[in-house]
Amino acid sequence: MGNCLSCCEKSKDEQYEPLLADREREAVADLLSFLEDRNEVNFYSEEPLRALTILAYSDNLDLQRSAALAFAEITEKDVREVDRETIEPVLFLLQSPDAEIQRAASVALGNLAVNAENKALVVKLNGLDLLIRQMMSPHVEVQCNAVGCITNLATLDENKSKIAHSGALGPLTRLAKSKDIRVQRNATGALLNMTHSYENRQQLVSAGTIPVLVSLLPSSDTDVQYYCTTSISNIAVDAVHRKRLAQSEPKLVRSLIQLMDTSSPKVQCQAALALRNLASDERYQIEIVQSNALPSLLRLLRSSYLPLILASVACIRNISIHPLNESPIIDAGFLRPLVDLLSCTENEEIQCHAVSTLRNLAASSERNKRAIIEANAIQKLRCLILDAPVSVQSEMTACLAVLALSDEFKSYLLNFGICNVLIPLTDSMSIEVQGNSAAALGNLSSNVDDYSRFIECWDSPAGGIHGYLVRFLSSEDSTFAHIAAWTIVQLLEAGVPRLTAFIQSSDDIIELLNDIVARDANNGEYEDGEGDVILLSGRALHLIEQDTDS
């Protein structure tokens, strides 16, 4: 602000004063007076703003410079919602041929653009066009301030699309490669702010942003690394852009893996999330494992910092979808940490990702199922499941349903009392939890050496197997009715006299089975799955009658 004061004081010099119009001399005097008492003056009020405006619109560059510097200092200390009478003179100063005036005016505009209402007004008053022009300035300070202002403007959702279509993305992308680290930071920060909608991401990709962002990943500046990594992570949300990345950026995965080993937790976190988003595609699921990402992900998984744990477990969840990755993940030592994360009750997302990963790992191999069970996963699931949030219950019951497919481990699951937690969950408020729990019970009911647990749980807890079968047979959802009818057939075909007697004496079950079979009369067309339900119900009734006759 010293420059501002000295410039205003110079106007009192005799040889300079005749060059000023009366209103400009008055404005200089008024501004000096206001500045002497600056802590008590509202510079956005009528008289101070009038003085600043007169100087801003002066033909005299020294007075314009004073106004620009004053605006820069005032807005640094006092940011509030302002009207066009404040912003318009600042925008006018941006058009000055003088680099110092441009620099100070862009600082003032960037300060004002911290306020949401001001952000919208700057764009409404065509400030973007002026800032784009400033970004093309040969002066680094002007570039830096202009890009910083656009970064602020781009945090307002209603501005993002306007910026994307304004022609700003090309200059921003070029300035992201600037040799000045401040310009790089501001430019990559602005590009990041433009990655939060599909339409804007399309505009970014069309502007050639991807190769620039990838080239900056090895930057020595943590902020630039963070902005670029996060931008790539957001761009990788879209399948079409993942395809583009796969075609044009062969070093991307290895660069992101290296960033998981940096000293900055926020960069590590975003690198893992970027890999997670890339791993939505089968190609990347394989490449990430083949590129030796597992040791770094395991290290992050064992961190005490929740965002790092969440990012890494989310990445592992996606990677584990591919059958070829199941054994490498298990062999890399992930099972114990994943089972431990089931107890992370302070973050249900972590719980969901951990148990979903276990389910994926169990999908195609008896060896993997055995490893998961040996890692004490069943104990953890049984202990936690009834008190877990619904989203976690859904994943846990789905995992149990997969584990219950294995004939080798059904008796283990039953003897561990898993029915006692699954039965109450068949009456959950969540349709998914109901269905998964019933599917797990159905899987356990087939080809078991000992059905004593089903006998013990026939009437309890929570209405027992009996109550669950009645609810599901009564359901309008053919999938639920199918699970119940299929389970009844399995229990009857097991040939356990006491279990068969329970079913035979259950008039409600028999009545519901008859109602389902009756739908077959004079009806040649069925909704999805209904025909199978009718066939299974008929099979169940046949087995009941057969056992009764014998």
Swiss-Prot record:
Q: What are the UniProt keywords, alphabetically?
A: Golgi apparatus, Lipoprotein, Membrane, Myristate, Palmitate, Phosphoprotein, Repeat, Vacuole
Assign the protein's first listed, main location to one coarse class: Golgi
Q: Where in the cell is it found?
A: Golgi apparatus membrane; Vacuole membrane
Question: What's the encoding gene here?
Answer: vac8
Biological source species: Schizosaccharomyces pombe (strain 972 / ATCC 24843) (Fission yeast)
Q: How does it sit in the membrane?
A: Lipid-anchor
Q: Which residues carry this modification: Phosphothreonine?
A: T548
- The answer to whether UniProt assigns keyword Magnesium to this entry is no
Homology family: Belongs to the beta-catenin family.
**Lipid-bearing positions (N-myristoyl glycine):** G2
KW Nucleotide-binding (keyword) present: no
| ARM repeat windows | 75-114, 116-155, 157-196, 198-237, 241-280, 282-321, 323-363, 454-493
UniProt function note: Functions in both vacuole inheritance and protein targeting from the cytoplasm to vacuole.
**Protein name, as recorded:** Vacuolar protein 8
Provide a GO CC annotation, any one.
Golgi apparatus
List Phosphoserine occurrences by residue: S550
What Pfam families does the database record attribute to this sequence?
Arm
Q: Which GO terms describe its biological process?
A: autophagosome assembly; nucleus-vacuole junction assembly; vacuole fusion, non-autophagic
